[in-house]
Amino acid sequence: MIDETRTTVDQSELDHFSRIATEWWNPQGKFRPLHQFNPTRLAYIREKICLEFNRDPVSLMPFDNLKILDIGCGGGLLCEPMARLGATVVGVDAAQTNIDVAKIHAAQNNLSIDYRTTTAEALANEGEKFDIILNMEVVEHVADVNLFINATAKMLKPQGLMFVATLNRTWKAWGFAIIGAEYILRWLPKGTHDYKKFLKPRELKNFLSKNALTVIDEIGITYNPLNDSWNRSKDMDVNYLLLAKRS
């Protein structure tokens, strides 16, 4: 059992995202960057799940009978495409306002998604297991990364996959994700990111390995200002994604 007197929730982060929850499904709003690079990360997730679970990548519903957990799901930007691909999806977020928005949008699109207002540590203590866990752009917002990874790892089935996307702790990431995105371009509200919470890939790999998770792939996701697009890259200096497998 995980000690729930300890928490992964950072109240200031929770308050911040609660204030802007109504913006989740506005592609030109405060979550514009997520909408922009969502297709890139979705393509990667689909490709790797099909490869590791031996699914037909051209099938309309390749994730049929797979159970997916999206932690820190926000308004459901990842949950909805996972459900459309056939997965049984559970989306959790500590912010009730985010879950409210996600539920309404799913209902409007006739999608069956199990949304819950809870934390990783509380859910882990319920004993539920998943084939795939998505920790996308969330570890840089939690209060205790080690506790968070420990809790999420406990919910992963043997040979299950965990996708973890976050920001590297480099001056380049500080300049792009904070100074550029928040203060100059104003893509994101000021205060969205805290540089001290950014993680170097080796640090994140260490947290994963301590919890019986082996990194089997890694990519960077970079922005091209010439065509206003996001693409996979070997450059992990700013945004990066690790794919880990449970032993």
Swiss-Prot record:
Lineage top rank: taxon: Bacteria
S-adenosyl-L-methionine keyword on record: yes
Catalytic activity: a 3-demethylubiquinol + S-adenosyl-L-methionine = a ubiquinol + S-adenosyl-L-homocysteine + H(+); a 3-(all-trans-polyprenyl)benzene-1,2-diol + S-adenosyl-L-methionine = a 2-methoxy-6-(all-trans-polyprenyl)phenol + S-adenosyl-L-homocysteine + H(+)
Pfam families attached to this UniProt entry: Methyltransf_23 (PF13489)
Signal sequence, renumbered to the chain: none
Cross-referenced SUPFAM superfamilies: S-adenosyl-L-methionine-dependent methyltransferases
Associated pathway: Cofactor biosynthesis; ubiquinone biosynthesis
Enzyme class: transferase
UniProt feature coiled coil, ranges: none
Keyword field: Methyltransferase, S-adenosyl-L-methionine, Transferase, Ubiquinone biosynthesis
UniProt cross-references to CDD domains, sorted A to Z: AdoMet_MTases
GO molecular function terms attached to this record: 2-polyprenyl-6-hydroxyphenol methylase activity; 3-demethylubiquinol 3-O-methyltransferase activity; polyprenyldihydroxybenzoate methyltransferase activity
UniProt binding sites for S-adenosyl-L-methionine: R41, G72, D93, M136
Enzyme Commission (EC) number: 2.1.1.222, 2.1.1.64
InterPro entries cross-referenced by the UniProt entry: SAM-dependent_MTases_sf, UbiG_MeTrfase
Any one GO biological process: methylation
Family: Belongs to the methyltransferase superfamily. UbiG/COQ3 family.
NCBIfam families: UbiG (TIGR01983)
Its biological purpose: O-methyltransferase that catalyzes the 2 O-methylation steps in the ubiquinone biosynthetic pathway.
PANTHER family: METHYLTRANSFERASE (PTHR43464), UBIQUINONE BIOSYNTHESIS O-METHYLTRANSFERASE, MITOCHONDRIAL (PTHR43464:SF19)
The protein's name in its UniProt record: Ubiquinone biosynthesis O-methyltransferase
